[in-house]
Regions:
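Conserved AMP-binding A3 loop
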Residues: 32-34, 169-197
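Conserved AMP-binding/adenylate-forming core of the ANL superfamily
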Residues: 3, 20-65, 69-73, 90-95, ...
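Structural core segment of the AMP-binding/adenylate-forming
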Residues: 49-50, 77-148, 479-481
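AMP-binding/adenylate-forming catalytic core of the ANL superfamily
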Residues: 89, 106-108, 258, 266, ...
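Conserved pre-ATP/AMP-binding loop-to-beta segment of ANL
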Residues: 19, 131, 136, 151-173, ...
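Conserved beta-loop-beta connector loops within the AMP-binding
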Residues: 358-382, 416-419, 481-485, 520
Length: 537
């Protein structure tokens, strides 16, 4: 017997097995899995009643809230494709995504209503806008109220045995940090098997770091429109754990929810972890329930891992993946048989880690062959497995470029050691080539981050008449701390080969970032290459 693989089955299972258990916490509201599933089914019914067709793209523009989580199941239950929108995108970028996807319906949170109103003239395919909170009578008459929508008709129970598991379930657009956003098509099968692979990965370490269970309480600190955020939504549902929603990341609010809801785990980007470790407010809250923080979205560092474990009292491991891979490919929990301690252990936990079950991962050199597993030879990470995307939406050429010879080419350059742990060196297009030598910006950034005065650092190439390009550091200092350019350059020279060291340091007040805290190096490079032709990429 073959039954289609679809994440719709996860919420159906949680409703049947954990009906009275609190499944979702959002502000002062609490929903059992029975209530959560009922609301998702009513959303599906409302969409079907409004003649939503199988394959329609339905967009949602919202911060993390219970309604966004309901959309993950209700939209799929109606046979449609979920299209989460990045709230940090500029209006013209959002309009591009909506037009590219040809979205029919839009769900929008009240703060973003002005954007939704502008889409009436810039996005011809949009037919109906639903207001997630607030009242259309007071805010915008053209919108329809979400809760009235759910109350207005019966729930719709999708017959998941009739779902095509290879049809598109979710359409996520890449961040566009280096080029225009591309729509990543993830199928029902992709999403279903990713959740099971992540659950299995939690059992591949004797310490069970990152393990999910019915006792898990997950704080959604990363926006659900981002890979690191939505990658956990289905995993916690199928085991009957508890979702805790937070609209915006703020250390005090995070600490308060961790204390009040007895949060056990969360995923964060490095800048979020750094903000928690540097906040003096943590002393006012009980964080003893917190077991694990999974760091992803950008490269971590041994210094950050050590500081977080010491100050937050929990384990920190790294996760690696991409939007195109559903997203998780690897985790850095320590395998059985290894006995790393001290600095070696912190270094291993800051690595991308080893492949999770169901993923085949290789590091290939320029000749197309696997690099030696010596921790120093570099190559591009390629992967294959059941969680790899179907392709890029309406971009067959980009799909063909990324999916070659049966493997997805990630564009990430890495090393692999004798224990099969990978270490990300850089994005392929962000390797600095100075006088013929390859320099990893991440390697230099990790050294700078170890300086006691440095809060965060970014290293980019800048033009140089002799070497073509040389590394330059942009450093944000910790509040109240000081450091000079010469001090930081000497710090690097004591720890790096001379050619890898930055030639200069600037001290901006902040670094431009995506909605999830990833530094926009494209914006930084543009400032320094403005006088050069065709170099910004």
């Amino acid at each position: 017997m073959k039954i289609p693989l679809t994440p719709i089955r996860f919420l159906r299972y949680a409703r049947e097995q954990f009906p009275n258990k609190v499944g979702v916490v959002c502000g002062d509201q609490r929903f059992t899995y029975l209530q959560f599933a009922e609301r998702a089914a009513r959303l599906a019914g409302a969409l079907v009643a409004r003649r939503a067709q199988p394959g329609d793209r339905i967009a949602i523009l919202s911060t993390n809230c219970h309604r966004l989580l309901e959309a993950y199941y209700g939209i799929l239950g109606a046979g449609c494709i979920l299209l989460p929108l990045n709230i940090r995108l500029a209006p013209q970028e959002l309009a591009f995504v909506l037009n590219d996807a040809q979205a029919r319906f839009l769900f929008v949170e009240r703060p973003f209503l002005p954007l939704a109103q502008s889409f009436q003239t810039t996005v011809p395919s949009l037919e109906i806008t639903f207001l997630l909170d607030g009242q259309p009578e007071a805010d915008w008459l053209a919108a329809q109220n979400y809760d009235n929508l759910l109350a207005g008709g019966p729930p719709f129970e999708c017959d998941f045995t009739q779902v095509d598991e290879d049809s598109i379930a979710e359409l996520f657009y890449t961040s566009g940090s280096s080029d225009r956003p591309k729509g990543v098509m993830l199928t029902h099968r992709n999403v279903y098997l990713h959740a099971l692979s992540v659950l299995a990965a939690g059992q591949t370490s004797p310490t069970t770091l990152g393990e999910m269970s019915c006792t898990s309480v997950l704080l959604h600190t990363i926006p659900l429109f981002h890979a690191n955020g939505w990658g956990t939504a289905h995993t916690i549902t199928v085991v009957g754990g508890t979702h805790v929603m937070i609209h915006h990341f703020n250390p005090i609010d995070v600490f308060r929810l961790m204390d009040r809801e007895r949060v056990t785990t969360c995923a964060m980007v490095p800048t979020m972890v750094a903000a928690l470790t540097h906040s003096l407010e943590r002393a006012n809250y009980d964080l003893s329930s917190l077991r694990t923080i999974v760091i992803g979205g950008a490269a971590s560092s041994p210094t950050l891992v050590k500081e977080a474990q010491e100050k937050l009292g929990c384990a920190c491991i790294s996760g690696y993946g991409l939007t195109e891979t559903s997203p998780t490919l690897a985790k850095s929990a320590m395998k059985a048989g290894l006995a790393w301690e001290g600095d070696q252990r912190y270094a291993s936990q800051a690595m991308a880690g080893f492949a999770i079950p169901g993923v085949e991962l290789r590091v290939l050199g320029p000749d197309g062959k696997e690099v030696p597993h010596d921790g120093s030879a570099i190559g591009e990470i390629v992967v294959r497995g059941d969680t790899i995307m179907q392709g890029y939406w309406r971009q067959p050429e980009a799909t063909a470029t990324a999916m070659r010879d049966g493997w997805f080419h990630t564009g990430d350059v890495a090393t692999v050691n004798a224990c099969n742990y990978i270490q990300i060196v850089d994005r392929k297009k962000e390797i600095i080539v100075s006088g013929g030598e390859n320099i990893s910006s991440l390697e230099v950034e990790k050294v700078l981050s170890a300086h006691p005065s440095v809060y965060e650092a970014a290293v980019i190439p800048v033009p140089d008449a002799k070497w073509g390009e040389v590394p330059k550091a942009l450093v944000v200092l910790k509040p109240g701390m000081k450091a000079t350019e010469n001090e930081l350059l000497e710090f690097c020279r004591a720890r790096l080969s001379h050619y890898k060291c930055p030639r200069s340091v600037d001290f901006p007040e902040s670094l431009p970032k995506t909605g999830t805290g990833k530094v926009l190096k494209r914006e930084l490079r543009r400032q320094y290459w403005a006088a050069e032709k065709g170099v910004v990429s």
